[in-house]
């Protein structure tokens, strides 16, 4: 599990250290303080792939839907200063460290443009690059480059990394994959199709999912794929099955999150703006589910990070973690902008009720 992170020169983080992560981590703070950016920084190193280049492009190409080009590349660096390299260092619970450094390498074309000289044809064909250096316990695992260029508009296209050799990553084993669920997950049905297939191919998982859907709405009896690979739900007193699109954002968000826990072998799950689309009455249900998934994880090392800007969600969280006796494994990290720096403030789950009574500002 992730114990701590230090982020330098990444997006709005000039230099921020956050220590003491636990099993359930809630990230709060004001607008544009970096809650989502924190999840992305963690995902670069503890993500879907062992390869940070792949994790970063997953964020830009598939989650943010703003492919990594010159403008979006600049926004990755604090203050748009591409001369300073990005560094993200994560400490795991076994005291191992993962250290990622990202450096911008301007193409000759870019250098010529900045000098206001007309570039040659050869220079215009050379893309700028991001150089990735990954270290584990201060030992360099690999050094790779990612070209900053348009990606073809074709389904299933994957970026190719210049020097990627899977054998280099053996030193990162055992690798524990992660899942990131974006704030607009209700509109990303395509991202849960794979998870749903795995669940619906397993009778026991299918039964569990149907029970969880029935807890959300007791009129829902089951979910399945039709012959056109669309998700359809069987609803009480309605003859024909209804498409998932006929339901509200709350059910879609709930299904996306629950299916990620059930289907993936991920040990780290990041959920951005967890309350989006959910009625307050279903926030409690979702939190109970999340804590049950953490408690029932056979290896005991499932870790969850959630961002929220909802006071109501935090109040419900306080109720659920006390009900589930999970307060000592819950922390709230409030990010606050202080001049150039983002400063974290830690609040402990067992003291949330006390913070409320004293009208503590848990949102920066």
Language-model segments: which ranges?
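Phosphate-coordinating catalytic segments in nucleotide- and nucleic-acid-processing enzymes
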Residues: 48-264, 268, 336-356, 361-364
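Switch/communication elements of ASCE P-loop NTPase nucleotide-binding domains
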Residues: 1-56, 238-364
